[in-house]
Amino acid sequence: MDNSFLLVVVGMCVVIVAVVALGYYQKQKRMEEMRALAARQGYRYTERDDALAGALAEFALLSRGHSRRATNVLSTEADGIAATVADYQYITGYGKNQHTHRRSVLLLESGQLDLPAFVLRPEGIGQKLAGLLGQQDIDFDSQPDFSDAYLLQSPDEARIRSLFGHEKLAFFARRPGLCVESQGRRVLYYRSNRRLSPEDIPSFIEDGLAILLLLAGERAAAPTGEPDGLAGLDAVLADLSVDEVAV
């Protein structure tokens, strides 16, 4: 056997082993960081939740691809609001053409919610989704900045126009790049196609809660009660101004 060929084979094997080892190290490091965050903040930590992955895939925004996974799941509940953050992953394509997509997502659930179903995502990257939903973009002539920044779709346009008043439209127009989807009592939120660093997770949850309160028509007082996990969620909800959300 040609020595040069043997060296090439050995070199390729070394590279493959190094890539696998690096991937394993990064995975373990993130798990440890998320566990530490859960311990500090009082969240519940689950390494992997297949049921959650299935529930997230029911949202149009996360319905693409296959081999869906929800890992490093952080969850808590307070004052009737359940908050769940996860590293959501899915794959598009197969074989040499496959690509893995990862992002941090927040799922908020409350039996007190009764929002119309809708999908809100940045304009310009939602045309494929528009075809999937079979619905047209709902524009607002009074808020061209919002309509230029976002694609808004719903099977109930009348309710959406009633829900998205001036304050809500201005809020989102000032914060381009957000993705929000409502299924009535459940709201999905994420703001980028990447995983957030652990230190950004608490503010990510607070931003999502502020958006939830805005959509629900609440701006200040939250239900009273002892918080369970979010280190004073009732105080956060009471003090958080939707105009101060950092995105």
List the model feature ranges, each with a label:
Residues V17-Q41:
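Transmembrane-cytosolic junction motif
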